[in-house]
Amino acid sequence: MKKVLALVVAAAMGLSSAAFAAETATTPAPTATTTKAAPAKTTHHKKQHKAAPAQKAQAAKKHHKNAKTEQKAPEQKAQAAKKHAKKHSHQQPAKPAAQPAA
């Protein structure tokens, strides 16, 4: 922590790196009597790459439509016919005029 503080102070004051190195060289080095164990072997995990999906248009990505059911488009109607649903009146077709017997 003190080294970091000294580095920040030295950088702020604009001291040369040689003067800073001389200052930090006076700190006692740790003793070499301690033995360190070899670091554990690191295993690198490989990512499994997925197959890239087929490219689609932007609208096809957003709107998922069911391709299985192909529905027929309804017949186009006039605007008034869409708004006003007519009730079916039960009219029988007109009978032909009775012909006199000859």
Curated annotation (Swiss-Prot):
InterPro entries, sorted: Acid_shock
GO CC entries: periplasmic space
Keyword Signal: yes
Main location: periplasm
Bias kind Low complexity: ranges: 22-41, 91-102
Residue ranges of the region described as Disordered: 22-102
Propiece residue ranges: 22-58
Keywords, in A-Z order: Periplasm, Signal
PTM per Swiss-Prot/TrEMBL: Proteolytic processing gives rise to the active protein.
Localisation: Periplasm
Bias (Basic residues) ranges: 80-90
Secretion signal, residue range per the UniProt entry: 1-21
Pfam family, one: Asr
Assigned protein family: Belongs to the Asr family.
The protein's role, per its UniProt record: Required for growth and/or survival at acidic conditions.
Entry protein name: Acid shock protein
